[in-house]
Amino acid sequence: MNQDMLNVFLKRRSIRSYTGEPIPMEKLNMIIMAGLSSASGSAIRPWELIVVRDPQKLIDMSGCRLRGSSRMLAGADAAIIVVANENLSDVWVEDSSIVMANMHLMASALGIGSCWIQGRLREAIDGETTEDYMRRLLQFPSECRLEAILSLGMPDEDLPATPPESLPFGKVHINKY
């Protein structure tokens, strides 16, 4: 593996605090392209991306989780919501997760702060499911299921890269568990 690529993986952190400075559109487009280029089972690509930059909509979205860090959306410059048509693929969760991971890593490589906000199987502050809460705000069709939300902004914190020696190599098993 290329050392530069490994450094991107080690540098990727969940960033929840943003400066308020806008993300340049060319960088946001690169993050989107990273998602669109994701691997997909049988190349079905059951997912759709909803990009939100409207400040009021981001504030409204910040209530999408009862617990967790969705409140950061109120201070984000953008969010990318990944939904997928579950009727198109039985691996829509996996395919959508690959999209999220690619975008999360690209954001890090570009110096953009990002954080994965789990949407599937979660509850919003008003008692709805996170999926129904987001569907009401973003009007995605009923056959589309919510996987996750990627919060994006210029980072207001600089977290250190993960030291390679702290990686859990004990979780690696060769030839048997």
What name fits each language-model region?
Residues 1-177:
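Acidic, surface-exposed loops and disordered segments
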